[in-house]
């Protein structure tokens, strides 16, 4: 079949469109005079084997294949932008102030510098840095619907994000293992010095894992299809291996270890509760005349000690549950986006990314609220630091406050605290 092609006159200018064609076509072509100039052939990237005013000629089109990339963002409607921005502002405000108060309490008050509280302060410090170095830029990206801070800071922000995330997970893992050793193995090995050493090791390890993102290895897509640089679809085996590695370190391995620890703790608490309830009260009464009241103190002391340990375990369990709810969706999303081209290039990927990132950031805001709710020392210290004009919450009268040291009742080490 013979086609007739009519070419319009040549107009100078630039074009950002790349046409990818792989064809061998036979055309009946009559070129206008403007196209017969020899200087125009490099611009057209056409190689003409034969050309004649009339008759059959051969046209070979050679070009380089360039994959088409969909638009970076799908524009968010105004109500959704306002909603997401308001949520982000609330999370940013609570995360920064709440975790700052936790850090200041541990730093300023010597009584708060127990091993567990030092670990919680490190977790709060990581959450506070996440609020300062990541959340504001994600908020600006939501308002502008595009990343405006350049390629270098996009990579650096991705490094900060995973650095603080891995550090927070490491602290939660250390606390869970410590609870397991205390309750199940009855080994109380953690002290403030060892806690500081573990914190230093965890920060160094987290930095080593996250640093390759800052130097472009793996090379993230910029601009990203999310409010910040995230993992995207790729066929690079090294890129895919890094995503799997960071997912294992930041979620799956800690999840399995913490879950195993909590199952062991639950089993131990169940056996101890049965032993306490089955303690023969008659034996205590029969021995009272010989041993005084010491025999009567044992079941009471065991009950109080188990109540302390159970409350401490419950607090860590709540932190673990919040971690799972906030991070499981984002971890799954990162893996699917890396290996599924269809998922990564779908039209609402930006909106999905935003909601899942906001859920991750929500964990940083919930942690200080959990400390305030569950840990009495943090609750009291927070009220003491608060100016009198801002103390709206009702407080117990002074004569009803506990006046004895918790260690006197709970029989804990001096470096322990009520968690």
From Swiss-Prot:
Membrane topology: Multi-pass membrane protein
Expression sites (tissue/organ): Expressed in brain; detected in the frontal cortex, with lower levels in the thalamus, caudate, hypothalamus and midbrain.
Glycan-bearing residues: 16, 28, 62
A GO MF label: G protein-coupled receptor activity
Extracellular side: 1-81, 139-157, 217-240, 339-352
InterPro entries: GPC_Orphan_Receptors, GPCR_Rhodpsn, GPCR_Rhodpsn_7TM
One CC-aspect GO term: cytosol
Transmembrane stretches, start-end: 82-104, 116-138, 158-177, 197-216, 241-263, 316-338, 353-375
Classification via CDD domains: 7tmA_GPR63
GO BP annotations, alphabetical order: G protein-coupled receptor signaling pathway
UniProt keywords, alphabetically: Cell membrane, G-protein coupled receptor, Glycoprotein, Membrane, Receptor, Transducer, Transmembrane, Transmembrane helix
Stretches in topological domain Cytoplasmic: 105-115, 178-196, 264-315, 376-419
Keyword NAD in annotation: no
Family classification: Belongs to the G-protein coupled receptor 1 family.
Biological role: Orphan receptor. May play a role in brain function.
Protein name as annotated: Probable G-protein coupled receptor 63
Source organism per UniProt: Homo sapiens
């Amino acid at each position: 079949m013979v086609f007739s092609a009519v070419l319009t006159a040549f107009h100078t200018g630039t074009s950002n469109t790349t046409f990818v064609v792989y064809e061998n076509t036979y055309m009946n072509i009559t070129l206008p005079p403007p196209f017969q100039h020899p200087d125009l052939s490099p611009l057209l990237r056409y190689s003409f084997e034969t050309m004649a005013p009339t008759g059959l000629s051969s046209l070979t089109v050679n070009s380089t294949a360039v994959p088409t990339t969909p638009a970076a963002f799908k524009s968010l409607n105004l109500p959704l932008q306002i909603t997401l921005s308001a949520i982000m502002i609330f999370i940013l405000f609570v995360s920064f102030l709440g975790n700052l108060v936790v850090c200041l309490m541990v730093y300023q008050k010597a009584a708060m510098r127990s091993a567990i509280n030092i670990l919680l302060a490190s977790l709060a410090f990581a959450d506070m840095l996440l609020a300062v170095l990541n959340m504001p830029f994600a908020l600006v990206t939501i308002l502008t619907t595009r990343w405006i801070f350049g390629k270098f800071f996009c990579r650096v922000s991705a490094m900060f994000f995973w650095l603080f995330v891995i550090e927070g997970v490491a602290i939660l893992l250390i606390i869970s293992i410590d609870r397991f050793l205390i309750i199940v193995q009855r080994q109380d090995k953690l002290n403030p010095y060892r806690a500081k050493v573990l914190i230093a090791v965890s920060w160094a390890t987290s930095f080593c894992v996250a640093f390759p993102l800052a130097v472009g290895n793996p090379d993230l897509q910029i601009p990203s299809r999310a409010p910040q640089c995230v993992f995207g679809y790729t066929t690079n085996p090294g890129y895919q291996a890094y995503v799997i590695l960071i997912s294992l370190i930041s979620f799956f391995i800690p999840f399995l270890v913490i879950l195993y620890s909590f199952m062991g703790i639950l089993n131990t608490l169940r056996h101890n509760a049965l032993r306490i309830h089955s303690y023969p009260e008659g034996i205590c009464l029969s021995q009272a005349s010989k041993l005084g009241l010491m025999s009567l103190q044992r079941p009471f002391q065991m009950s109080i000690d188990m109540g302390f340990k159970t409350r401490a375990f419950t607090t860590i369990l709540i932190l673990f549950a919040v971690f799972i709810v906030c991070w499981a969706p984002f971890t799954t999303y990162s893996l699917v986006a890396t290996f599924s081209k269809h998922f990564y290039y779908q039209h609402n990927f930006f909106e999905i990314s935003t909601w899942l990132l906001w859920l991750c950031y929500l964990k940083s805001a919930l942690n200080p609220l959990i400390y305030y709710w569950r840990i009495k020392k943090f609750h009291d210290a927070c009220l003491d630091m608060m100016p009198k004009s801002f103390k709206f919450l009702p407080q117990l009268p002074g004569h009803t406050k506990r006046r004895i040291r918790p260690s006197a009742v709970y029989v804990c080490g001096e470096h322990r605290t009520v968690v």
